[in-house]
Amino acid sequence: MTDIETWPGRPYPLGATYDGTGTNFSLFSEVAEAVELSLFDDDGAEVRVPMTEVDAFCWHVFLPRIGIGQRYGFRVTGPWDPSNGHRCNPNKLLLDPYAKAFEGAVDWHPSCFAYDFDDPDTRNDEDSAPHVPKAVVESPYFDWGADRPPDVPLHESVIYEMHVKGFTATHPDIPDLLRGTYAGLAHPAAIEHLQSLGVTAVELQPVHQFIHDSHLVERGLRNYWGYNSIGYFAPHNEYASAGDDGSQVTEFKGMVRSLHEAGIEVILD
């Protein structure tokens, strides 16, 4: 992956967009002086690709033959001016705010922080890449069939607020491997239970990609509820039975399709 062909690409849509021949990458920044796209292989080896095209503050590049499952992040060179909110540092791998899938998690290594703990005014130049999630190029292809939102009138709605993991974790008729996952919620046993209650919509507590707070991790605990999102366009990878290589997106879509087929709407908290 050392010889990367690059085309100018386009500024929109933001994030990573695969079109069948390659992937367009675009990142918005008003203050960046230079942006690099970091690509990672299965072993974590990194290749940096300069993003030299800029339109309306959107830095962009198209990479032929770079496709589904590619791990990536951004590195931004620019002002270091914490008092004005600018902490640009190319040693920090930045998450794509428009990513649709993530692999891995934040492990709260000191390199994840922009500053040194002993001197908060000092810039921390340790590379954070080994300690943060990588965005993943996901597949835009999915067979929705004849899917349509049930569109139940509000006065007829029965909404069940639920936690994907909690709702499916102990259901005796859901296979062990599917408990706590999107696929578990799509299982016939889960759907039949909801239908028996007369439920017309499920309101899912946070399913966006989120992090486990450092103070919880230090105590061997986890952020159960998920109200700490870092990727609003990506389904949380730990709720996927299929893994976090982008398959979580397909699994999430399959869950929505199955619920819709049962006449159940899906609302995100």
What are these regions (language model features)?
Residues F28-A34, I66:
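Short proline/glycine-enriched turn/loop motifs at strand-loop junctions of beta-rich domains
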Residues L194-L221:
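Carboxylate/His-rich catalytic cores and anion/metal-binding grooves
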Residues D173-G184, S214-E261:
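Aromatic- and acidic-residue-enriched carbohydrate-binding clefts of CAZyme catalytic domains
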Residues V158-Y160, V202-L204, V266-L268:
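Hydrophobic faces of well-ordered beta-strands that scaffold small-molecule active sites
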Residues K165-V202:
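A conserved hydrophobic secondary-structure block that centers on an alpha-helix together
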Residues M1-D19, E46, V54, C58, ...:
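The feature marks proteins involved in alpha-glucan
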